[in-house]
Amino acid sequence: RHEVELVAQTTIFIFGGYETTSTSLSFIIYELATHPDVQQKLQEEIDATFPNKAPPTYDALVQMEYLDMVVNETLRMFPIAGRLERLCKKDVEIHGVSIPKGTTVMVPLFVLHNNPEFWPEPEEFRPERFSKKNKDGINPYVYLPFGTGPRNCVGMRFALMNIKLALVRILQNFSFIPCKETQIPLKLYTQGLTQPEQPVILKVAPRGLGPQAEPDFL
């Protein structure tokens, strides 16, 4: 019994931590490569916050507004968990819809995050949706990359900090550029976790050397 539980917990750690974070980073870097103006603006914020490639600190990372906007917009477009499932604990009625106790309720996050009723031109990558000016106007229940309430993702803060730290360290040293193998637009596999249908292929250029670097894979 203990061996089965150990395997189950290990599997949860891998899928809940490693796979989700790495896939989110792939989506973010893809969007930066296909939106060079956003990539440049983010690198300028990074260079201003950590001059001369200084090691990132927690206090500085949490103050980086544009980095937060880029991460949030990518998680809107590509929520790694395409849906949330919750078990109804008691009979309830919401807007005239009766939900009996014991019913599994599914929230389709990918559809919610790409609904033009809440997100004008949802297929467009616009970090400004999450600017200080616009953020307060977002209904908290239409943006749920980590769920919400007492059952939201327990690793949310850790995951966001890992993603931001990785992005800063990578973008301090490299820029990303589309190449002929880059799939535009990106096709998604949405059975289970949201992920690219094919590997994301981009050119990786050391900062300052321009687009002549050889392609690498993400």
Curated annotation (Swiss-Prot):
EC number(s) stated in the UniProt entry for this protein: 1.14.14.1
Compartments, record wording: Endoplasmic reticulum membrane; Microsome membrane
SS bond list: none
Cofactor field: heme
Conditions for induction: P450 can be induced to high levels in liver and other tissues by various foreign compounds, including drugs, pesticides, and carcinogens.
BP terms from Gene Ontology: oxidative demethylation; steroid metabolic process
UniProt keyword Oxidoreductase present: yes
Membrane protein topology class: Peripheral membrane protein
Family to which this protein belongs: Belongs to the cytochrome P450 family.
Protein's UniProt name: Cytochrome P450 3A19
